[in-house]
A protein has these predicted regions:
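Conserved acidic donor-binding segment of nucleotide-sugar-dependent glycosyltransferases
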Residues: 283-284, 288-296, 303-309
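Conserved donor-binding/catalytic core segment of Leloir-type glycosyltransferases
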Residues: 2, 156-175, 180-186, 198-199
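A charged, aromatic-enriched C-terminal amphipathic alpha-helix characteristic of glycosyltransferases
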Residues: 309-339
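Acidic donor-binding loop of glycosyltransferase active sites
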Residues: 239-253, 267
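Donor nucleotide-sugar binding/catalytic pocket of nucleotide-sugar-dependent glycosyltransferases
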Residues: 114-152
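Glycosyltransferase donor-sugar binding loop
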Residues: 38-41, 168, 196-211, 227
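Nucleotide-activated donor-binding/catalytic signature segment of Leloir-type glycosyltransferases, i.e.
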Residues: 210-232
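A short, histidine- and acid-enriched strand-loop-helix "catalytic/donor-clamping" loop
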Residues: 68-72, 88-105, 118
């Protein structure tokens, strides 16, 4: 079996999901039966890379690819072409919810996607949207994290002010980082009290580095950048927090790993309603939801949640809602197709 994956130490969702799938395949089938094609910096040695891809496709029965926005335009047609000679199973595991929107304007790529053995998407809506494009070879492989789920007896129920909030995603404007900062500042200033603190975790998007450096210099003491956390340590870090904030502006998010992290740690989420939110979040069950870009609604939710009892009431439901996103459950659909 071969998996096409970048061999790097990035902490973005694409890299984390790729590593999670690779690690679960190794656990299931043994490292000696899994070969990895490293896509990191492949353009520096294109001839070597192309030869390796051909060789690996020829020598395997199952190829799993996880290309993102740019890679899908290259790797799907490339492997489809060579597969005319080798007739192997090619599976595409999509990271995020963006693929239907991309394909809607690219008929040629839609035709290529139809040729794949199976396309695994993260959400129900993605499957429905691809079906409208006459792509029928689709199944749902929910995003998952190979992390422990907090034991219910270890849930935190005692809180005092200031209440600790955090974000745990890529640091960029489109993830709503500035909205989170603005809302927390406004609530604290209006009450003339530090009701909330905010810790910002995650890799800083390269397009946002300069802006964020300037922004950090203006932040009050109760808001700080807390750096990056290894994926496997997320539950341990997050479990102390009152709420995780996810005010994303990306409407095509899939099942964000940060949401899985928070719920696995027993931490309810305050999130904007992206297209696929309903596949993982239920308002006032494991989360508190507001319409995307509605800062007033976001602010009102946090004002309302100064009442600690409203959060404590749903703490145990966060753990109950995460079961289907456990690795051993999520991967069954991929194993089934590999072993056909």
């Amino acid at each position: 079996m071969v998996i096409l994956a970048g061999n790097n130490n990035f902490l973005d969702g694409q890299t984390v999901k790729t590593k999670n799938i690779y690690n679960e395949l190794v656990r299931k089938y043994g490292e000696e039966n899994i070969s990895k094609i490293d896509t990191f910096n492949w353009k520096k040695h294109p001839i070597y890379f192309i030869r390796k891809c051909r060789k690996e496709l020829r020598n395997t029965e199952n190829l799993i690819i996880l290309p993102a926005h740019n890679g899908v335009k290259v790797f799907v047609p490339f492997f489809n072409f060579w597969n005319k000679f080798y007739h192997k199973k090619i599976f595409y595991a999509v990271v995020g919810g963006w693929l239907p929107e991309l394909l809607a304007s690219k008929v040629w790529l839609t035709k290529e996607i139809r040729k794949l053995s199976k396309v695994f998407v993260e959400t129900t809506k993605m499957k429905e949207d691809l079906s409208k494009l006459a792509i029928k070879n689709v199944e749902i492989l929910v995003n998952f994290k190979s992390i422990p789920i907090l034991n219910e007896k270890d849930l935190k129920y005692e809180y005092s002010r200031p209440l600790e909030l955090c974000t745990f995603s890529r640091v960029m404007k489109e993830k709503g980082i500035e909205d989170a900062i603005d809302v927390v500042e406004k609530i604290n200033e209006e009450t003339n009290e530090i009701v909330y603190t905010l810790d910002i975790y995650g890799p800083i998007d390269k397009s946002y580095v300069d802006r964020f450096e300037k922004l950090k210099n203006t932040l009050p003491s109760y808001i700080k950048y807390a750096g990056c956390v290894d994926s496997e340590k997320s539950v341990e870090v997050l479990k102390k927090y009152y709420l995780l904030l996810f005010p994303t502006k990306f409407k095509t998010e899939g099942i964000p790993g940060t949401i899985i992290d928070a719920l696995s740690a027993g931490v309810p989420v305050v999130a904007s309603k992206w297209e696929n939110y309903a596949d993982i979040l239920v308002n006032e069950e494991n989360s508190f939801l507001f319409n995307m870009n509605d800062l007033k609604e976001f602010e009102n939710i946090l004002k309302n949640l100064k009442d600690i009892n409203k959060v404590i009431e749903i703490k145990n439901k966060t753990l109950q809602s995460i079961t289907k996103f456990k690795s051993e459950t999520a991967m069954q659909v991929l194993y089934k197709n590999i072993e056909k």
